[in-house]
Amino acid sequence: MSDFQREQRKNEHVEIAMAQSDAMHSDFDKMRFVHHSIPSINVNDIDLTSQTPDLTMAYPIYINAMTGGSEWTKNINEKLAVVARETRLAMAVGSTHAALRNPRMAETFTIARKMNPEGMIFSNVGADVPVEKALEAVELLEAQALQIHVNSPQELVMPEGNREFVTWLDNIASIVSRVSVPVIIKEVGFGMSKELMHDLQQIGVKYVDVSGKGGTNFVDIENERRANKDMDYLSSWGQSTVESLLETTAYQSEISVFASGGLRTPLDAIKSLALGAKATGMSRPFLNQVENNGIAHTVAYVESFIEHMKSIMTMLDAKNIDDLTQKQIVFSPEIMSWIEQRSLNIHRG
């Protein structure tokens, strides 16, 4: 594939992603908090700091991986980096493969560091990159963490995608052992299982982003690029973010779990944190905000999102993220069926 074709593919991904709409129904709607009428705290008591063994985030929200690798996406990364700087959010760039192949494309990613020199930035590579390239991806952005995206459904629907996956787990293990910053194993919208969590724990992984279905749909994106558009029947493949977080429960004491995929509102973010996530990521909402409404409006959107989270936490009498994990939740019969059929041990306060 030529560099021009790769740039075109990056732009197609963004165009199709922006055109997608939120799912009509979400598993976040199938879980409810139990309301208690009189909180014992005030809004000003809320501490939204997200703390993991290696990373401290001012807020449990991050701009998740989406783009880079073309002139248009350079402009997007530049604007998102300004938003991240002004709101103190962490930010992940999209796959840096284009820059690792062609130095001319490096600036479409490094613009994020240029615009946000003191901020927290995650670099991003695929599960098949050589260790040396993973190290290069971290150095490229002076990144505080490295996302490794695992995206087999996307690859298999992508006309020119990868068809070989047998080396992925071993390669991830090699990268984890060599890279000096936290390595986050990141799905791309298909969710994670407890079996995968076991495998990742065995090779030393300490961070995952479950990225469940319901948000940006890469099966649909790649199917739109197919000549016959003949794989749309896979559109609903995978686990939701709620199901994925429940799948991780037994591993949350050893692995820091991030949640993304289909988060629409501050309440969805709070529900993710209550299920054990340390932070929550969004891609398309930020992309659409910054492209359609500009930087200032997007900054205001983030500030409002944070204030709404504080209000919800006050209603829940939760001073911090850890408190949220003790709050009572009622699940729908459908989610309870998933918990039972998957033999998941869910214990709550």
Swiss-Prot record:
Its main location: cytoplasm. Mg(2+) binds at residue 155. Its cofactor is FMN; NADPH; Mg(2+). One of its GO terms (cellular component) is cytoplasm. It catalyses: isopentenyl diphosphate = dimethylallyl diphosphate. Substrate binds at residues 9-10, 95-97, 154. Homooctamer. Dimer of tetramers. Involved in the biosynthesis of isoprenoids. Catalyzes the 1,3-allylic rearrangement of the homoallylic substrate isopentenyl (IPP) to its allylic isomer, dimethylallyl diphosphate (DMAPP). HAMAP family: Idi_2 (MF_00354). Belongs to the IPP isomerase type 2 family. This is Isopentenyl-diphosphate delta-isomerase. The lineage of its organism: Bacteria, Bacillati, Bacillota, Bacilli, Bacillales.
